[in-house]
Design a protein with these regions (language model features):
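Short alpha-helical scaffolding segments that buttress acidic/His motifs in well-ordered protein cores
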Residues: 48, 68-72, 111-112, 128, ...
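Methionine residue identity
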Residues: 1-4
Length: 176
């Protein structure tokens, strides 16, 4: 069994809470956990920066850090930010600046990876695998999935409604 710090477990919990497809009863349990160990924006950013530092140093990584570092490796445009923890903690990433928020982007990669690994919503794993083969790139497939997830999240927020798994899956199927 791999030992994980409270911060790593909390990040996993936050990813699960962000996922619209984790069952409600599980989310209620997770929300109680988050109420006790709710990491700040700085702690989440620190997780990614520390993981990147450990990765570049060749240090031993936890399974979550290994997954995160694989996505970081595929995003050289984020690596300078990840290599500067103090700058990363202070920087604001707003649409007006035209800069992608690397921490949101990487968190979405982790969330989508989790959705695929547990096949939630049911069918996403097959869609992701088919799309990866079609595009000959798991990374590009995740970026297209990310666009669909972002759209469904935006619609739910705009309408003050729950996320619609069917709409999400329907938009993913259109990618095929």
């Amino acid at each position: 069994m791999v030992a994980m710090s409270a911060k790593h477990v909390t990040l996993i919990v936050l990813i699960a809470l962000l996922s619209p497809f984790v069952p409600i009863n599980t989310k209620l349990i997770l929300e109680k956990y988050v109420a006790l160990f709710n990491p700040s924006r700085e702690e989440v950013r620190q997780f990614f920066c520390t993981t990147w530092q450990k990765h570049t140093d060749g240090s031993l990584l936890t399974p979550l850090e290994m997954l995160a570092s694989q996505w970081m490796e595929l995003h050289p445009e984020f690596q300078a930010i990840l290599s500067d923890p103090s700058g990363a903690l202070e920087q604001e990433f707003t649409p007006e600046k035209g800069i992608t928020n690397p921490f949101l982007h990487l968190s979405m990669h982790l969330s989508i990876s989790e959705q695929i690994s547990i096949d939630q919503p049911p069918g996403i794993r097959q869609i992701a695998n088919t799309l990866s083969k079609k595009l000959d790139s798991e990374h590009e497939a995740q970026h297209q999935i990310m666009e669909c997830l972002g759209q469904v999240l935006w619609q739910a927020q705009r309408d003050a409604s729950a996320l619609d798994a069917n709409t999400y899956l329907e938009s993913l199927r259109k990618l095929l």
